[in-house]
Amino acid sequence: MDTFDAIYQRRSVKHFDPDHRLTAEEERKLHEAAIQAPTSFNIQLWRFLIIRDPQLRQTIREKYGNQAQMTDASLLILVAADVNAWDKDPARYWRNAPREVANYLVGAIASFYGGKPQLQRDEAQRSIGMAMQNLMLAAKAMGYDSCPMIGFDLQKVAELVKLPADYAIGPMVAIGKRTEDAPGKRRSNSPGRIPLGKLLCLTKVWCLAI
């Protein structure tokens, strides 16, 4: 599928076939696509929890979100990020670079992130978002649909899955075969989309009022 087709056809689907399963190769392809997303200094701080256990998925649905896709989608992925990945053996992120380049960048990582917890958290969420978009567009290109979800108790779910304390929790992503059509998007100003002209600022200083 053409990249632009995947972008415009991707919708947040709520209803999935609970009996459909992805093959191991399809899952691998999705995960490989997700980790091609860019990260600052190539830190690759995203982490993906594949929630397979039916009872765990049912518990999450019943107690912390009540969204059908939590149990019905073929895949339920909790996307998180290691906030301290910048300080965990950073040389590995540049192991294939020339030594001079690697030494410089490893030092720059420490200088850029050290002692800046807010920046570290912000970077975690930025990285989560870019990986999620890769994941959802890859799913669309493979003929599947997806739904990003934030409508759940983040703290309770983090505790339930024993997420490490130094990880930032992000949205969940449901992926699978849809059973109902979602409203379409057009390449023009589709219903609900703010017109492009109100989102672009073409002057030297900020000019947007909305």
Curated annotation (Swiss-Prot):
Gene Ontology biological-process annotations: response to herbicide
Cited InterPro entries: Nitroreductase (IPR029479), Nitroreductase-like (IPR000415)
Keywords from the named record: Flavoprotein, FMN, Herbicide resistance, NAD, NADP, Oxidoreductase
Listed GO MF terms: oxidoreductase activity
Keyword presence, NAD: yes
Coiled coil: none
Cofactors required: FMN
Pfam family of the protein (one): Nitroreductase
UniProt cross-references to PANTHER family, sorted A to Z: NAD(P)H NITROREDUCTASE YDGI-RELATED, PROTEIN DRGA
Family: Belongs to the nitroreductase family.
Function per UniProt: Controls resistance to the herbicide Dinoseb and metronidazole. Involved in detoxification of Dinoseb via the reduction of the nitro group(s) and this process is accompanied by the formation of toxic superoxide anions.
Protein name from the UniProt record: Protein DrgA
Organism of derivation: Synechocystis sp. (strain ATCC 27184 / PCC 6803 / Kazusa)
Species classification: Bacteria, Bacillati, Cyanobacteriota, Cyanophyceae, Synechococcales
Gene name per UniProt: drgA
